[in-house]
Structure formats: structure tokens, C-alpha cells
Amino acid sequence: MTFAFDDVDGLRIARAGTGPRLIIAVHGITASLMSWGAVARRLPGEWTLVAMDLRGRGHSAGLPGPYGLPRHAEDVLRVAEHVGADGGTVLTGHSMGAYVAVLAAARRDFARVVLVDGGLPFPPLPEGVDPDAALAAALGPALDRLRQTYPSAEAYVEFFRNHPAFAGHWSDDVEEYVRYDLTGPEGALRSRAVPEAVRADGRWLHTEQAALTTALEAVKAPMTLLRAPRGLLNQDVPMLPDDLAAPWAARLPGLRDEVVPDCNHYTIVFDDRCVATLLDRLTAP
């Protein structure tokens, strides 16, 4: 599937498909719109997917702050207006993008909202714990790579090939995602993601649980939460464990909670089998 690129007030967007039904897709905290490449490739003919690079990421990296998830939600709503979203439009987000989707859906009606391994408030940090330290502990290698430079595109690809989440799950979609993220001169290549944008958004996620709770309760559209049973490093501890998700599923009658078997936080949007489940939920009647 080939993306057609455009800009909306400096935000890079990409469109795949030509169908009348619309999906708007939002990526994670250090990612880019190319994290939706596997979804775009399998898109049914009656659908169009619009993905966007969030402020401070991808080809939207040059947009200024302030950052924070409410700012990203405003950008999503601006893109929705630009592409002609209507009451039949589906909104989805992966990881941090799921939280952005919640904030956007609290302000505008969508046909449904599909949250992919994100969207539920994290427990408050213990007293004295610095949000930046909590973010670093949670993201691990994903944050480390933003501080590094790479001698070649192949070296950056190799970094991702060695990531435990992609062991045995490498694909053309993953490689295209990785190469899209690179910028800078040969010999000193780096990720396009702006470290301060990532830190600012991470602080917001770890300190604004009340705002997320209010937004979740304000969403009128039916919501589907798709959870990966394994985490960012393919470990047994998921991003959203059962004891976090169950109370929210009970609290919000419009929320359907589902675990997608045999995937981790990354492969839930890259692995063909996992993507088939995701697409089924996105395009359900």
C-alpha cells in the first residue's frame, strides 16, 4: 500500500485507500505515521486510512511546542476537519496515540473509537517519583535511541532488528517504519522524534490521570480496547494488565475490552495476524 502525503498547517498526514469510509489513526510516543503501514496494506477497498505525524515526530518534528496530549488532540481534530470526517468516521490510536484519541473523541463524535494498547490512565506515581524517570523506566530502548546518532541507515535498522519486540517478527512494514524515522547527515543519523516532545508528553501521561478520566467518561462513541498480552520488550508484563483494564470495562458500559493473543506492544500493529484482528474491529459494521 502506497501512502499519499500532504500537510495540514505543518502537520504531515498520509492517506491510503480511496473508499468512502474513513479511519483516522494516531501513533505512539516515539513513533510516526508509518506505524500504520501494515494496517494500510490490508485495508478493505471501501475504506480510507488517514494517519498523521504528531507534533514533534516524523515529518511534523519541526512544529513548535507546547506539547502535551491536549495539543495533539487539537491537531487530530484539525486533521479530521481537513479530511472531511463525519459521523461515520472511526478514530484509532496506538499506545500514546490511544490517549490522544480519547481526548479528541471527548470533544467530537465518531462512529467508534479503537484504542490499541493504550488509553487507560496509569496509576498515580508514588510520592517523590520523578515523571521523567518513570518515563525512562517504561520506555527503555525506545527513549535511549533518541539520544544517539547512527553511522548509517543500516545501523539504525540493525538497532531495531535487535530489539526483543521484533525478534522473529521483522517485516517490510517494520523496516519502512524504521527508515522513515531517520534524519540528519550520513554518519550522524538520528531519530526524527524530538526528545523534549517525548518528555513533555510522558510527563502529561503520568500526571494528568484526572483529565483522562474525565475524557473517557465524556466519550459518546462505542470504544474497543485491544490489549497486547506482552510489553514493549516482549516481556510477560503487558502495558495494560488485567487489573487495570477490568475496573474500566466495568465502569464504562461503552467500552469493550479484548486481549489480542500472541502479540506484544509493537507487533499488535505490525504482525499480520494481529493486524487482521485490529482491522476487523476498525471496520466492523
Task: Name each region found by the language model.
Residues 218-263:
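Conserved loop-alpha-helix segment in the C-terminal half of the alpha/beta-hydrolase fold
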Residues 1-23, 44-47, 137-139, 246-247, ...:
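Alpha/beta-hydrolase fold catalytic core
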Residues 16-62:
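Conserved HGGG/HGGXW glycine-rich cap/lid loop of the alpha/beta-hydrolase fold
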Residues 87-130:
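Conserved hydrolase catalytic core segment
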Residues 147-237:
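Alpha/beta-hydrolase
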Residues 116-151:
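A catalytic-pocket lid/entrance helix-loop region that shapes and gates access to the active site
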Residues 54-92, 263:
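Active-site loop/oxyanion-hole signature of alpha/beta-hydrolase fold enzymes
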Residues 260-272:
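Catalytic histidine-centered segment of alpha/beta-hydrolase-like enzymes
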